[in-house]
């Protein structure tokens, strides 16, 4: 089965898009650019200002709010198109043959191993701290396609970034509801999502 891939990218950033397109074409990976909300575009000022009025919006920069909005629009797109599982990448992520093989061997039987209330991180946790503070279980793991995802069992609150993750549409719908009920939050407020029982467990493999 084909696993849909969203790449969040500013429409005006042509040079970066061209580089991404070259890499994915070379690896023969299908993907779709998803136009990110541009915080520098005056047309987005109204929606950004509105998001600032709830939750922790007042503490966030325009760029952080725009990032949150971009990911939430992807969640809505997953729901609208009935996409069960999708990979969401930001345009600074580095992909390689390991990522290609993960996609190549991902099929229906692999999908059945995934749980809707778990978040599967495809990397992006290296270089965030001075030392490896995320502890991963040696025993609680799941082999999906060619990759082994291990449960994060220590310092879950240190998980950051939204650069590469695999998510189910049920979780996407719950995150949109969280915005409606709680208000604005950062796109990578994984701790908050865990506290609201939207994410049960985090599984990580640096793909």
Features from the language model and the residues they span:
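An acidic/histidine-cluster motif and surrounding catalytic segment
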Residues: 1-89, 93-207
């Amino acid at each position: 089965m084909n696993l849909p891939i969203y790449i969040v990218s500013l429409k005006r950033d042509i040079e970066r898009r061209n580089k991404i397109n070259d890499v994915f074409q070379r690896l023969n990976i299908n993907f779709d650019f998803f136009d990110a909300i541009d915080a520098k575009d005056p047309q987005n000022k109204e929606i950004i200002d509105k998001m600032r009025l709830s939750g922790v919006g007042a503490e966030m920069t325009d760029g952080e709010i725009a990032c949150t909005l971009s990911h939430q629009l992807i969640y809505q797109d997953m729901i609208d198109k009935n996409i069960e599982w999708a990979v969401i990448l930001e345009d600074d992520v580095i992909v390689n043959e390991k990522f290609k093989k993960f996609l190549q061997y991902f099929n229906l039987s692999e999908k059945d191993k995934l749980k809707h209330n778990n978040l599967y991180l495809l990397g992006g946790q290296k270089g965030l701290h001075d030392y490896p503070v995320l502890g991963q279980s040696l025993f609680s793991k799941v082999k999906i396609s060619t990759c082994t995802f291990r449960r994060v069992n220590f310092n879950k609150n240190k998980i950051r970034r939204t650069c590469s993750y695999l998510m189910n549409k049920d979780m996407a719908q719950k995150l949109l509801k969280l915005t409606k009920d709680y208000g604005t939050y950062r796109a990578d407020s994984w701790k908050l999502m865990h506290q609201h029982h939207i994410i049960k467990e985090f599984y990580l493999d640096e793909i």
